[in-house]
Design a protein with these regions (language model features):
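Intrinsically disordered, low-complexity, mixed-charge
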Residues: 1-157, 161-165
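Conserved small/polar residues in nucleotide/adenosyl-binding loops
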Residues: 358-364
Length: 365
């Protein structure tokens, strides 16, 4: 993510002139400069991003006064839609830094993280075509958005406590309710979750009753990878998935018993880590939590701020709309390789990568 500001920064560094713009889910880049600089520019861009496909063409010389990000335009062809990405390490550090202006701001993002797919209204992917267009940038955020060297340059979902979305309940209030054994509905990236303390079996049983859910284990949200290791055995491959920008639920072998109300007697646990700032802040206050989609089993995940009231539990919500519902992804590692049990948040709407296979010739009768 953040291809255009990264291209701008590299071009400025290498003395390259030209333009870069969104074209309906793709990027068109025109660059002019010395041969060695252009080669370095291309290599560094390719190293910085997972580029699925690109075409390179030599054009007649055009003089440019500098390198600029130009206005997005539509284009034909199959577009590239960006997935939602978990809070990056830089944003998490700022979130927990009392000296930072975004300290404890539950909607902190940058070019490397935050909601994309779930907040997009249309392509090309620009702020005015996301739900964040409803939140005009304050002068400080506008300065970051327009500064090439800033990691929030052209980051479409940025905001701050002064100009961004607002919570409907204080996080500490929600944490206190959870400590008291309450079930709380929490608005996530792709929908609402029903949450309860993993240390409170009656609260977990209440979630099962609300959802009309039979003997099917619940996933557990842990504060960090160290806490996951207290309860589960974690291989290198599993840890890589847990810490990835997709933040999926990963099926792990347990090593410390969890209540049967969570596991239903299984020796495996669906574990995952916080994928957004609101979860990070909540887990700082109480952890681990049972976290499951707010729905009646078999029904779609709830995204509506009014419909969530049907569950009859306190609600920790906010005024940033969810346009596209999406559930948490679920994977397990089999023989060292990740296998999807549910491909969703963090991976959708990316194309499924090709899998190698062998053609078998079946004998004829």
């Amino acid at each position: 993510m953040g291809f255009r500001p990264t291209a701008l920064r590299l071009a400025t560094e290498l003395g390259i002139t030209g333009t870069v713009c969104n074209t309906g889910g793709r990027v068109t880049l025109t660059a002019t400069g010395e041969g060695a600089a252009l080669t370095a520019f291309e290599k560094r861009l390719c190293r910085a991003f997972s580029i699925y496909q690109y075409e390179e063409n030599e054009l007649p010389f055009q003089p440019f006064s500098g390198f600029t990000i130009t206005h997005s335009r539509g284009a034909r062809g199959l577009p590239f839609l960006p997935p939602d990405l978990a809070t990056c390490p830089d944003c998490q550090r700022e979130l927990l830094d009392p000296k930072n202006r975004r300290y404890r701001h539950p909607f902190i993002t940058c070019i490397h993280c935050g909601p994309r797919y779930t907040v997009m209204e249309a392509l090309p992917y620009d702020r005015e075509r996301t739900v964040m267009g409803r939140f005009p940038l304050c002068p400080d955020c506008r300065a970051e958005y327009t500064t090439p060297a800033d990691r929030r340059c052209h980051a479409q979902t940025i905001a701050c406590p002064h100009c961004g979305p607002q919570l409907t309940m204080d996080i500490e209030t929600a944490a206190q309710l959870l400590r008291q054994g309450e079930v709380v509905a929490v608005k996530g990236i792709g929908g609402y979750h029903l949450c309860a303390s993993a240390a409170n079996p009656p609260a977990v049983a209440k979630i099962r009753q609300i959802k009309h859910r039979g003997q099917k284990p619940f996933a557990v949200l842990f504060r960090n990878i160290e806490e996951v290791r207290q309860y589960c055995r974690v291989s290198q491959a599993e840890e890589k998935l847990l810490l990835s920008a997709a933040r999926p639920i990963v099926l792990l072998h347990s090593k410390r018993p969890l209540p049967t109300e969570i596991t239903c007697g299984s020796d495996r646990v669906g574990a995952f880590l916080p994928c957004n700032p609101l979860q990070i802040l909540l887990l700082e206050a109480i952890s681990p939590l049972v976290v499951t989609s707010a729905n009646i089993s078999g029904a779609p995940m709830c995204t509506d701020d009014t419909a969530v009231q049907q569950f009859g539990v306190p609600v920790l919500g906010h005024d940033r709309p969810i346009l596209t519902p999406i559930d948490d992804s679920v994977l397990q590692v089999t023989e060292g390789n990740p296998a999807f049990m549910r491909r969703a948040r963090g991976y959708v709407p990316l194309a499924v990568e090709p899998v190698s296979y062998t053609h078998l010739t079946l004998p004829t009768k």
